[in-house]
């Protein structure tokens, strides 16, 4: 037996919640509450009777937890590490649906406490389109420092064409279909650096990236 005494009791539980910079949904108190409610809170229990698998199983049922890992130490401590699901997009569809999408394209409840600002998605957002295609675009924005800071809103038109509302500059960006979005945004970034920095960020009302190898700008009236 790895424990000092056969009848050693658990004297401490260490809880680690990962990804708190992006997701502030789950508190340590909440995790304790789940385990207490199920009667498997480890402190005070005999170490040999504590099932780390049961702890992992119960915590993983939580809708905001991606995975849970539990292990015991020889000194009588139980360690619990929880990975949260990361919200990428906040969907507020014109059909009344309201939810977060996580980094794996799974729907999260709208009442989740999100600590970081998330890109808002509006317009004709079908859930199937959001879970299959839109979330990948959201992950790209989230993982790219420049675009994460620059894009404030994604608007989905009835034909699933996409408009982007940037934080800086008073213009709309028309992306068209999501296909080749990386190439389209690379062109836009280049245009921002070379074009808009020279003529000013408010010269154009609309920037169209729909067609390959060109950018069509509409001047402000």
How should each PLM-predicted stretch be described?
Residues 2-3:
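Short, small-residue-biased leader/transition segments that mark boundaries at the very start
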Residues 10-12, 50, 63, 73-77, ...:
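Extracytoplasmic
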Residues 15-19, 82-86, 112, 123, ...:
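Flexible glycine-/small-residue-rich
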Residues 19-61, 112-138, 176, 186, ...:
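Periplasmic/extracytosolic POTRA-like scaffold domains at the N-termini of outer-membrane
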Residues 53-88, 103-106:
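Membrane-embedded segments
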Residues 66-67, 77, 86-90, 108-109, ...:
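Short beta-strands and strand-coil junctions in structured, solvent-facing domains, enriched
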Residues 81-158:
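Extracytoplasmic segments of membrane-associated envelope/inner-membrane machinery
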Residues 175-221:
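Extracytoplasmic/luminal low-complexity segments enriched in Pro/Gly and acidic/polar residues
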């Amino acid at each position: 037996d790895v424990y000092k005494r056969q009848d050693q009791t658990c004297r401490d539980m260490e809880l680690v919640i990962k990804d708190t910079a992006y997701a502030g949904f789950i508190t340590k108190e909440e995790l304790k509450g789940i385990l207490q409610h199920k009667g498997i809170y480890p402190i005070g229990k005999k170490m040999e009777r504590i099932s780390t698998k049961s702890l992992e199983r119960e915590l993983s049922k939580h809708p905001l937890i991606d995975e849970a890992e539990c292990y015991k130490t020889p000194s009588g401590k139980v360690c619990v590490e929880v990975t949260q699901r990361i919200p990428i997009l906040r969907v507020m569809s014109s059909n009344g649906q309201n939810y977060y999408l996580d980094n794996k394209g799974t729907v999260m409840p709208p009442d989740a406490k999100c600590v970081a600002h998330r890109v808002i998605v509006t317009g004709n957002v079908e859930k199937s389109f959001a879970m299959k295609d839109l979330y990948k675009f959201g992950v790209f924005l989230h993982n790219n420092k420049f675009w994460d800071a620059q894009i404030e809103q994604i608007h989905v038109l009835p034909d699933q064409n996409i408009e982007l509302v940037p934080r800086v500059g008073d213009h709309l960006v028309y992306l068209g279909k999501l296909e080749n979005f990386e190439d389209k945004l690379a062109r836009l970034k280049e245009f921002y650096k070379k074009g808009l920095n020279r003529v000013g960020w408010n010269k154009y009302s609309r920037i169209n990236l729909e067609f390959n190898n060109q950018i069509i700008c509409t001047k402000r009236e």
